[in-house]
Amino acid sequence: MPRPPKCRWVRSEPNVTHFKPVGVPMSMLDEVILTVEELEAIRLKDLEGLEQEECAEMMKVSRPTFFRIINSARQKVADALVNGKAIRVEGGNYRVYDEDQRGHRGMRHRHGQWGRED
């Protein structure tokens, strides 16, 4: 039996959760689902320009785990861009931390859908 996945830490839940090509109705598009932790990995590495080791520390995962998360995220984004698919950000196994409080206070645990607390 596989070990249950550990929660990844993310700074915040995304404000925007859907992206799609202009001029094509959503009903005609295939969709790629990007998890919240995959979006966080892209934010840390590609937007903030942090080293993978720093990103892994911030998300509280090992470097190999971060590498797998960022590779999965990049593959999904590339698929959506090249093949004209919509991107929906949802789900995953993560914790949201307050910028000022990285301890257990100020953290909310999320798994799967928005608003479902464990």
UniProtKB/Swiss-Prot annotation:
Highest taxon listed in the record's lineage: Bacteria
Coiled-coil annotated residue ranges, if any: none
InterPro entries in alphabetical order: RNA_pol_sigma_r3/r4-like (IPR013324), UPF0251 (IPR002852), WH-like_DNA-bd_sf (IPR036388)
Listed Pfam families: DUF134
Family, as annotated: Belongs to the UPF0251 family.
Alphabetized HAMAP family for the sequence: UPF0251
Record-given protein name: UPF0251 protein Teth39_0655
Originating organism: Thermoanaerobacter pseudethanolicus (strain ATCC 33223 / 39E)
Phylogenetic lineage: Bacteria, Bacillati, Bacillota, Clostridia, Thermoanaerobacterales
